[in-house]
Amino acid sequence: MLKSIGLKFALPAALVGGCFFLIVKAGSFSKPDPESPVEPPSKQTASVWNSSDSIFQPYGDAVKGLLTFRGNPTRTFYGTGPFPLQTPRVRWAYPDRGSMCSVSYLGDKGDTWCGMGWTGQPAVFEREGRTLLAFGGFDKKVHLMDASTGRDVKTPLLTGDIIKGSPTVDPDGYPLIYLGSRDNNLRVISFDGEALKTLWSLNAYDVKPVLWDDDWDSAPVILKDYLLTGGENGHFHVVKLNRSYGKDGKVVVRPKLIANVPGWDQELLAVFPKPAVSIENSVAIYENTVYFANSAGLLQGWDLTPLATGKPPKRIYRFWLGDDTDASIVVDRDGFLYVAVEYEIGNQRSQFVGQILKINPRIAGDSGIVWRHHVRTKKPDGVWSTPALTETHLIATTDSGKALGINIKSGKIDWNLNYGNQPLWSSPNVIDNKLLLATCDGLLDAYQLNGSQQPRKIWGLKVGRGCFEATAAVWNGRIYIGNRDGKLYGIW
């Protein structure tokens, strides 16, 4: 992320000017025609890291909840209903007095940050008969609260800087939260004591070299006792957690960093103006491949099977998008990738590729593009939020205030909601065929989806006094979302 909310260093001025809004349909640039069959990626039959059956499903069976950013390792689970059909109301605001604010520095310049920002989705989960909410805020703290009351159930953990990312709650039932901070550290945090406690941390500078920054915005994936995540240090990391319980019944971890691979190569550095190769999106895993992209727009897939024999992951897919890519990759049942890109540099590659794409990663190069859209009317523009996938549509929101419903087969934009050029950074949620959008003027809007038809608005609610950059968590029809006004809200 190259605006103030993200990297501590700014990228250079754009290389190429010119802005426009254009739909480029498949069939152009020698791409497969979306109306004709496109061979899906072949499925692997051996034991896999994350089955294709997990698409749209919760993150395993051990813990009920929305446990990570966009719900599961393919980033395709958005919570549970029943979604409210009547306008809900704010039941609590956290904190009830004051605000979650602190000073964070960009170089030697300090600014006050309040509330929760991009991506900022709380994790919500059931444990011991109650619903809990885990999140990090711009008060530099990790919180665990009772979702019904908005009250802390554990003493918050103070880190050294603001927290921008979304936590992951252990999907196997260990009392652990995984979350990074702008203080350079990714933490494994226990919650089986009176207070939240750091059991282990990985510093961005524990690997070399560091390109381009040292924050941790990605929400880690936990699978097979491994932690997998990208960092703004430019690396993809694999940590063996070695989770267990001690004689006192408390959770124990003995993590070991077993692999870190750079998310850049010399070919990328040769064509991008600065080594801005931070990984800010949350990695997505489909079968045995992990997908992510970086601030220089390098989309990549790494095979995880070598880990079984003690070897590092192997890169098997490379595609240059041309510009900063902070939205997480979304994967469908057949292994197609849905990719959303920002338009900040404005180079020839980003003008050619577009900002919303469906890609077949089994086909190398531009021939793997199934369809694409250019969504830029200014600079910067494009997409910061992670799109929501349904059985028929991809729903993407843009920096210029548009919510687009794109047919995943044809690539046609079937509908468009226009919010008048205000940034839509909060990722859209789809629950019970209802769409929830959060805007930068503090609005929560709910729509009834109806296939290719224009969605019908069913309610709208003004919440707080600031911008919604953070993404909502929806669980059992209750909505939890942080605002830049300094508050987290419980709404139902």
Model-predicted regions and their roles:
Residues 1-15:
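N-terminal Sec-pathway targeting helices
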Residues 3-4, 21, 197, 305:
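Polar/charged alpha-helical tracts
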Residues 21-32:
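Hydrophobic single-pass membrane-insertion segments
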Residues 32-61, 69, 76-119, 123-217, ...:
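Extracytoplasmic/lumenal domain signature
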